[in-house]
């Protein structure tokens, strides 16, 4: 009998109950007991969903009040010492302070969970870190499930992955030195689970899918030799990529089973079957835990039947990874197009699919004939639907030539024409795009969406906001202006709503971090632009000023990365379709008199595959998509792009290949350290290193920004430098925004004056600046939350 199980379930609730309970607790409107009660209700509901579908075990320990890595850090007792907390007496208030900071300490660093759009809290380790245990919440959850008569299978992030994802602020400290102490902490956890009669524990080790150095591979041997003595059977789970190259070594570990991701890496099945010990189970992730499309159940059954014949009861079935990454249920999607809805499966529906697969294997296809027929119908509907494949899009895509991704002239020639056309001063000042989204702006958009105000009144209100933004920028003395984006709820949904091939859910929320949830749009078919999206707004904004007004667009890779993407064609193909749609908008903006056009790509690095061997292929099509979107304009039109919170050094050749005339980046928190890579690489185009951190309400002084600009000039010649904040300003208030921008303009003018006094437009390149004293860049490798898709 094949067993069925899941690796984890979304914790937010189908109506985002956890989010609202968290935020009420933070406001002081709910007690800790009330928050705990909401959490317990959600856990029971989610376990019951699994039990009702006949799953052999229910996942426990996958719940977290904020983040599973933070909860494991608390369970181990490895809290950052700077907070001065007693792990054994940790309260929920203190737990949340670790994630959100307090008056004395900033929050723990947050970054992306592998290549997903979920963020985790990064453990802070050093030689003094101990793993003596913390609150008993993890065990209490297992007790809750056992008390309900359920077969609990607790879920733990494995010790090697935990160390891999941690960091140390002590230079040269080897995190692996902590492995022996860490394993003692894990053994105590497993001992307590064994004492409760737990048969199986799921140990997640997605790090096994990465490029690991020998010392880290050796750590797996050490870790599982130690944990074997603890008692419960261990299911070692990998996901997000192939672990086939480590299959032989992993199979020798003293564990009782393995989980592999056959959605992301179906080719690894043969290697794992060949390596699997005779005693071990093999859990196959055959339902996509990261996307929302229904599974082709017959195709999966064709894959599973030979495996079942070989393994018998040692075959387990599961989604590819935790269902954390998909919405909870389709039940509340009452307005979603009926045909599109029939193609989708959220977490609850994926439980149904898993149940069907298990019953088909363990009984017969006849028992689930109706469900298999429905699956067949959904697949046939997608293949035949006229909304999916658009001949004119396919024809246009086929006609794309390599030369279409190239500007007419090289940068050295373009920039001279742009300088002549734009007549900007040395060190031109600008912002990244958005201005404060006031309550009045949000209310206007909501009223229009509800039909409470008409299109004309909505347009008048938005134009009034644009006029305010333009006046404020002129008064501040900025050189290149923006319209402020008052009409945009976010940088992906706004464009997706105007592109064919996109769909939108009402309740398709997914946790990004803590209480922050995102509702990604759905790319279901060929993408094209039926009409201009931003041209009228940009034209109006430009009419209010003589200064250059930037057109503001989201790039094709960010549109792709922050959506649920169709799975019936390569992502590269969808990216090219998006690029052509954006290209049309870029050309129309130019025709409307917009001389500076920004195409934001904060998610470019997020798309990198986990294995470096796969990077070149991704970067090739991603960079080509950007170039295709940007290259239809004349030399005089200046193309900007923006990237934030990223480590660029290992992909600088690809960034240079994008050939944007100006790139703006986040650098203020790292005291311009990030810029050094651009200098060492001799980045050829213009660059705007952010001179102040928009994520902080603190208004930086003129002197502080001057120091950052001085440092920037040591790396990049001043004639190629722009002056700008780190990111968009939508999350800030107007008072702090105006004060910070006024200081920024003053800093730029002061440096211009100093350069002018020397009669110089160049700056002698000094030796590398001393190491920064600023905190390390958070979200390394990821877009910042100010650039994230619409969240709530």
Curated annotation (Swiss-Prot):
Q: Where does L-methionine bind?
A: 432-434, 485, 600
Question: What Gene Ontology terms for biological process does this UniProt record contain?
Answer: methionine biosynthetic process; methylation
List the EC numbers from the record: 2.1.1.14
Q: Which cofactor does it need?
A: Zn(2+)
Keyword Membrane carried by entry: no
Query: Which residues take part in binding Zn(2+)?
Result: 642, 644, 666, 727
Entry annotation: catalytic residues: 695 (proton donor)
* Catalysed reactions, semicolon-separated: 5-methyltetrahydropteroyltri-L-glutamate + L-homocysteine = tetrahydropteroyltri-L-glutamate + L-methionine
**UniProt binding sites for L-homocysteine:** 432-434, 485, 600
Q: Which Pfam families match?
A: Meth_synt_1, Meth_synt_2
Could you tell me which pathway this protein works in? Amino-acid biosynthesis; L-methionine biosynthesis via de novo pathway; L-methionine from L-homocysteine (MetE route): step 1/1
Where on this chain does 5-methyltetrahydropteroyltri-L-glutamate bind? 16-19, 112, 516-517, 562, 606
State the family named in the UniProt similarity comment for this chain.
Answer: Belongs to the vitamin-B12 independent methionine synthase family.
PANTHER family on file: 5-METHYLTETRAHYDROPTEROYLTRIGLUTAMATE--HOMOCYSTEINE METHYLTRANSFERASE
- Role this protein plays: Catalyzes the transfer of a methyl group from 5-methyltetrahydrofolate to homocysteine resulting in methionine formation.
List the protein's name. 5-methyltetrahydropteroyltriglutamate--homocysteine methyltransferase
Q: To which species is this protein native? A: Cupriavidus necator
Encoded by which gene? Answer: metE
């Amino acid at each position: 009998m094949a067993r069925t199980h899941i690796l984890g379930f979304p914790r937010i609730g189908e109506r985002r109950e956890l989010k609202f309970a968290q935020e009420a607790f933070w406001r002081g409107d709910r007690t800790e007991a009330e928050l705990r009660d909401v959490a317990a209700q959600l856990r029971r509901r989610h376990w019951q969903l699994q039990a009702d579908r006949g799953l052999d075990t229910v996942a426990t320990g996958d719940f977290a009040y904020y983040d599973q890595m933070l909860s494991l850090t608390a369970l181990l007792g490895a809290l950052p010492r700077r907070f001065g907390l007693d792990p054994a007496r940790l309260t929920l208030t203190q737990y949340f302070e670790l994630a959100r900071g307090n008056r004395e300490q900033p929050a723990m660093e947050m970054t992306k969970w592998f290549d997903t759009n979920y963020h985790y809290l990064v453990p802070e380790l050093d030689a003094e870190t101990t793993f003596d245990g913390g609150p008993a919440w993890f065990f209490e959850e297992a007790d809750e499930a056992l008390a309900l008569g359920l077969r609990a299978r607790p879920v733990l992030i494995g010790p090697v992955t935990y160390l891999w994802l941690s960091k140390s602020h002590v230079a040269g400290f080897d995190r692996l030195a902590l492995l022996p102490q860490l394993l003692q902490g894990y053994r105590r956890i497993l001992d307590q689970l064994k004492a409760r009669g737990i048969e199986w524990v799921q140990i997640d080790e997605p790090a096994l899918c990465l490029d690991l150095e020998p010392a880290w591979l050796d750590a797996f041997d050490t870790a599982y030799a130690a944990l074997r003595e603890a008692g419960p059977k261990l299911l070692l789970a990998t996901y997000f990529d192939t672990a086939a190259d480590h299959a032989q070594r992993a199979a020798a570990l003293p564990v009782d089973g393995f989980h592999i991701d056959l959605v992301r890496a179906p080719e690894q099945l043969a290697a794992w079957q060949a390596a699997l010990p005779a005693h071990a189970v093999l859990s196959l992730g055959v339902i996509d835990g990261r996307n929302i499309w229904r599974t082709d159940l017959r195709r999966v059954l064709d894959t599973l039947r030979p495996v079942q014949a070989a393994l018998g009861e040692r075959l387990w079935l599961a989604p590819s990874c935790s269902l954390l990454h998909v919405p909870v249920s389709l039940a509340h999607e009452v307005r979603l197009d009926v045909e599109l809805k029939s193609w989708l499966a959220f977490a609850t529906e994926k439980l149904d699919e898993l149940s069907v697969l298990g019953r088909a294997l363990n009984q017969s296809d006849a028992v689930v004939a109706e469900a298999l027929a429905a699956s067949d119908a959904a697949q046939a509907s997608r293949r035949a639907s006229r909304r999916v494949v658009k001949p004119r899009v396919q024809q246009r895509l086929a006609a794309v030539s390599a030369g279409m991704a190239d500007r007419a002239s090289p940068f050295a020639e373009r920039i001279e024409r742009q300088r002549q056309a734009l007549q900007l001063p040395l060190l031109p000042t600008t912002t990244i795009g958005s201005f404060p989204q006031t309550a009045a702006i949000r209310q206007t958009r909501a009223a229009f969406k509800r039909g409470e105000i008409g299109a004309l009144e909505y347009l008048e209100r938005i134009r009034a906001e644009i006029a305010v933004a333009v006046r404020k920028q002129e008064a501040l003395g900025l050189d290149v202006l923006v319209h402020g984006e008052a009409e945009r709820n976010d940088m992906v949904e706004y464009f997706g709503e105007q592109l064919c091939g996109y769909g939108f859910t009402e309740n398709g929320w997914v946790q990004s971090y803590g209480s922050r949830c995102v509702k990604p749009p759905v790319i279901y078919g060929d993408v094209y632009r039926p009409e201009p999206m931003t041209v009228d707004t940009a034209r109006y904004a430009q009419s209010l000023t003589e200064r250059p007004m930037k057109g503001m667009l989201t790039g094709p890779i960010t549109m792709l990365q922050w959506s649920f993407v169709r799975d019936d064609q390569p992502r590269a193909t969808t990216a090219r379709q998006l690029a052509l749609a954006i290209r049309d908008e870029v050309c129309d903006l130019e025709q409307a008199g917009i001389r500076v056009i920004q195409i934001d790509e904060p998610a470019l690095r997020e798309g990198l595959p986990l294995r470096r061997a796969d990077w070149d292929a991704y970067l090739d099509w991603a960079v080509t998509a950007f170039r295709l979107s940007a290259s239809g304009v004349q030399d005089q039109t200046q193309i900007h792009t923006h990237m934030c919170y990223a480590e660029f050094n290992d992909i600088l050749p690809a960034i240079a290949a994008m050939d944007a005339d100006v790139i703006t980046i986040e650098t203020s928190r790292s005291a311009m350290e990030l810029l050094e890579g651009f200098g060492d690489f001799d980045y050829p185009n213009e660059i705007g290193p952010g001179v102040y951190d928009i994520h902080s309400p603190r208004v930086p002084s003129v002197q502080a920004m001057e120091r950052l600009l001085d440092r920037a000039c040591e790396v990049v010649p001043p004639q190629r430098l722009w002056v700008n904040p780190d990111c968009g300003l939508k999350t800030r208030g107007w008072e702090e925004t105006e004060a910070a921008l006024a200081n920024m303009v003053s800093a730029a003018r002061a440096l211009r004056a100093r350069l002018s006094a020397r009669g110089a437009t160049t700056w002698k390149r000094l030796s590398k600046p001393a190491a920064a004293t600023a905190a390390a860049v958070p979200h390394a490798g990821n877009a910042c939350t100010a650039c994230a898709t619409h969240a709530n």
